[in-house]
Amino acid sequence: MALNFDQPMNIICMKWGSKFSPEYVNRLYAMVSRNMDSKFRFVCFTENSEGIRPEVEIQDLPELELPAGSPERGWRKLTVFKENFGGLSGPTLFLDLDVVIVGKLDAFFSQPGDFLIAHDKKSPKKREGNSSVFRFEAGKYPQILDYFEKNSE
């Protein structure tokens, strides 16, 4: 996939509940802005935007359809696969709020493939990914969320 410098690169995060303060979003934005040479669109999906710097685009946190009483456990990330998620299209990089960025991010957008996720080094024999950082084509995989919501018991 070649970089399209006319189109800003989508970089997103999610903040819900009280585990992370707005400062985590602000720091993440600052790290991204220092480590992107390309134009980017930074979007935070949250239910509380108080304290988040104005450069960050705020969108409502999507709901996840889980059976009543089910623990959330971070599954909310799967809502990025909703059809028309946040009005985003094209390559999108998801970053957890507690990642530390130490180098340029532009290469995440030039690697081939529609879905990229880090192999989980803790379980080298399993085919699992670490979802702290992953790149996907926005709007391309709604069946992932549909399947999870129908089979999450």
Explain the meaning of each model-derived region.
Residues M1-E153:
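Glycosyltransferase catalytic domains, chiefly GT-A lineage
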